[in-house]
Amino acid sequence: MPPHGRLSHPALKVLRVFLTAFTENVRSEIAGADIMKSAGISSGTLYPILLRLERAGVLASRWEKETPQDLGRPRRRLYRITPAGAAIAHEALNDLASPSTLAPNEA
């Protein structure tokens, strides 16, 4: 995983979605389509980010257990943030929000 300072803005938006869902106890697993809506990014941007974050151990995923016939739609891949990923996300987002990282006219 690159240092959090090298995380792209869209990757930080994705991590923020997970932290928000986790801290609000809304749900522990989130489908890609829901992440897209919450983060406001396209599927072409989202899925490569999810793959990189999963390979780095920041996220984990699984397929829904139900079959497409049971669901009446294709199965979804569900993503969750790992404990290590939560620590990385908190640190990256806190650093991003700290006054020392803001431009002089933003402080």
Feature locations, PLM:
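Alpha-helical residues within the helix-turn-helix
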Residues: 37, 54-55
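Exposed loop/turn and edge beta-strand positions of beta-sandwich/beta-sheet ligand-binding modules
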Residues: 75
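Beta-hairpin "wing" of winged helix-turn-helix
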Residues: 56-72, 80
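Residue-level signal for threonine
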Residues: 8, 82-84
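N-terminal helix-turn-helix DNA-binding core of bacterial DNA-binding proteins
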Residues: 5-45
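Short aromatic/hydrophobic contact patches that present stacked aromatics
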Residues: 38, 78-80
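Amphipathic alpha-helical dimerization/coiled-coil segments
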Residues: 1-3, 84-107
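Short, hydrophobic-biased segments on the C-terminal half of alpha helices
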Residues: 47-54
